[in-house]
From Swiss-Prot:
Highest classification ranks of the organism: Bacteria, Pseudomonadati, Pseudomonadota, Gammaproteobacteria, Pseudomonadales
Protein name as catalogued: Ribose-5-phosphate isomerase A
Function: Catalyzes the reversible conversion of ribose-5-phosphate to ribulose 5-phosphate.
InterPro entries: NagB/RpiA_transferase-like (IPR037171), Ribose5P_isomerase_typA_subgr (IPR020672), Ribose5P_isomerase_type_A (IPR004788)
GO biological process, one term: D-ribose metabolic process
GO cellular component terms given for this protein: cytosol
EC number(s) recorded for this UniProt protein: 5.3.1.6
Reactions this protein catalyses: aldehydo-D-ribose 5-phosphate = D-ribulose 5-phosphate
Gene source species: Pseudomonas putida (strain ATCC 47054 / DSM 6125 / CFBP 8728 / NCIMB 11950 / KT2440)
Record-annotated membrane-spanning stretches: none
Keywords tagged on the record: Isomerase
HAMAP family the record matches: Rib_5P_isom_A
Active site residues per record: E107
Amino acid sequence: MTQDQLKQAVAQAAVDFILPKLDEKSVVGVGTGSTANFFIDALAQHKTAFDGAVASSEATAQRLKGHGIPVYELNSVSELEFYVDGADESDAHLHLIKGGGAALTREKIVAAVAKTFICIADGSKLVPVLGAFPLPVEVIPMARSHVARQLVKLGGDPVYREGVVTDNGNVILDVYNLQITNPVELEAQINAIVGVVTNGLFAARPADLLLLGTAEGVKSLKAE
């Protein structure tokens, strides 16, 4: 199977998982990226089964609207049963690295509201230790150099992602060469740097369920 076929299979598995638990009042949190796009396309086949969605990026909002799915502001929604999103890496505890698509801050906010966070990914994303994928950090533009110096002190090698402005008007530093043995601690350390909006570690609030697309089929993992 190609990587796209694996993503498609795992996206369909996520729809199959949440669909029986949705009703006409349900609002679904939807992530950003190529795997999330497959989820949106599969979810759109059942758009009469739920009320609408909260999007974690402008790109996701446009794709949802293109399918005729109502998109709500998070501030107008009191609860989200599910948030479904992809990841760049996951460990066995379902701590994640996200943010390759630069939507990490809104993704983290929507995940924080959701009762159940379902991560969908192809099998290559499950790793023993996080950090081979560079860790994205969203930064207030004027603080970029200051934050980069602090990230070097933490052992990282930050690189400015040129030409990228987030939906919030900020910039991204991608931090290479981190061996992330304690994701919860590192997430807090980086977020404590003045000028950081948030970083791509989803460890304080990890995924609740990881659906993994493999050649043998979709595997379902809960945190160890």
